[in-house]
């Protein structure tokens, strides 16, 4: 399952036409230079795309609506190179539906005291323009990230990178579909929730299927496909038999292989990115899906136990947000089980039967 998609972020620079063609040409050139530097930094996980300078109400509105309908656009970065009258931004900002970052920066690092003139003052007004823009987005109470500092600084780039991952979470949240095998585990409270509200607020779609309908998909997996996956298991994992009969053990492993293939095919066919099971309703399944769930999570699927669709959606979302992230430690469903209350060594042992994602394993 593909985790890191080809999302892009639009870089939109604000100005106005009264500065003249020469000044606006410099504004565009500087913006392109900033975009090129951000992309070449190696810090940002996603590409930044330069857009023509926004100087009118109509152009701002048109650009933001194009961002709304562009499926590759995951967010908009705005910066005011010169002064840009903020009333020109109102309609566009009202209609923007993509995540927004306000980059409060400027082209130059320092004031050129020895050479500064009116041309420089006319062209470089980020401190003035970004305050005007910041005023209107605050007045409109528009959620956004504000990053302050010079665009060449690594800490600024890292803040933009972190926002990009958050923006991906916002965009991808509306594409998450959770498949529940059966329903909530009987009498369990914490795994319940308001699925309608979740779809309204987050975009999550949660559907339940009879366990035996999914079991039919498992039963349809051929013996040859199952054996091929079992061979993959035996190549990948260290098998500890500990006195077990090897042939019998392998038959049990084959059940998990068949479940993995059956579940994955069902998920792909129905276009779900997360799955929920619970051990109180296994129907025709021969075993609790354990190793099968481990491997589905490793491939990028979300998972929640005992009917917990919220955890399943969040596991999927966190996997998407951290995809390709250096030093990412992995994402898994876990439950708090028991405490260690020794003073100075307090901790919680977390687990959940067999359904732990290998991405968090040490080794």
Tell what function each PLM region has.
Residues 18-20, 57-58, 84-87, 109-110, ...:
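Flexible loop/turn segments at secondary-structure boundaries
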Residues 96-100, 142:
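A short helix->loop->beta-strand "cap" motif at the edges of active sites that frequently abuts
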Residues 60-73, 90-92, 260-269:
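Short, well-structured alpha-helical segments in soluble
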Residues 52-66, 156:
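Structural motif
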Residues 81-82, 98, 104, 111-127, ...:
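Anaerobic metallocofactor- and corrinoid-dependent redox/one-carbon enzyme cores
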Residues 25-41:
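Short catalytic helix/loop segments, enriched in acidic residues and glycine
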Residues 45-47, 104, 109-244, 248:
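Cap/lid and interdomain-hinge subdomains that line or gate substrate/regulatory clefts
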Residues 3-26, 175-184:
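Short beta-strand segments enriched in small/hydrophobic residues
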């Amino acid at each position: 399952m593909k985790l890191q998609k080809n999302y892009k972020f639009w870089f939109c620079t604000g100005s106005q036409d009264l500065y003249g063609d020469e000044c606006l040409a410099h504004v565009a050139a500087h913006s392109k230079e900033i975009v090129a530097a951000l992309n070449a930094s190696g810090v940002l996980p996603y590409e930044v795309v330069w857009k023509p300078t926004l100087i009118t109400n109509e152009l701002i509105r048109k650009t933001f609506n194009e961002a709304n309908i562009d499926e590759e656009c995951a967010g908009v970065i705005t910066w005011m190179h010169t002064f840009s009258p903020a009333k020109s931004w109102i309609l566009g900002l009202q209609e923007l539906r993509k995540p927004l970052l306000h980059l409060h920066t400027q082209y130059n690092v320092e004031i050129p005291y020895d050479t500064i003139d009116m041309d420089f003052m006319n062209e470089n007004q980020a401190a003035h323009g970004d305050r005007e823009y910041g005023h209107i987005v605050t007045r409109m109470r528009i959620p956004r990230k504000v990053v302050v500092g010079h665009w060449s600084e690594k800490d600024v780039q890292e803040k933009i990178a972190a926002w990009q991952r958050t923006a991906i979470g916002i965009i991808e949240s509306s594409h998450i579909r959770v498949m529940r095998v059966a329903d909530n585990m009987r009498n369990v409270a914490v795994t319940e929730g308001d699925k309608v509200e979740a779809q309204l607020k987050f975009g999550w779609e949660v559907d339940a299927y009879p366990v035996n309908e999914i079991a039919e998909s498992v039963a349809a997996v051929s013996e040859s496909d199952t054996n091929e996956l079992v061979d993959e298991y035996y190549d990948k994992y260290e098998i500890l038999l500990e006195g077990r009969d090897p042939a019998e053990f392998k038959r049990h492993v084959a059940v998990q292989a068949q479940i993995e293939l059956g579940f994955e095919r069902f998920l792909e066919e129905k276009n779900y990115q997360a799955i929920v099971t619970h051990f109180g309703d296994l129907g025709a399944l021969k075993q609790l899906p354990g190793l099968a769930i481990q491997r589905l999570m490793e491939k990028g699927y979300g998972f929640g136990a005992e009917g917990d669709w919220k955890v399943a959606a969040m596991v999927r979302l966190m996997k998407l947000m951290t995809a390709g992230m250096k030093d990412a430690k992995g994402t898994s469903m876990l439950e708090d089980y028991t405490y260690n209350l020794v003073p100075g060594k307090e901790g919680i042992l977390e687990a959940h039967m067999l359904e732990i994602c290998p991405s968090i394993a040490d080794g």
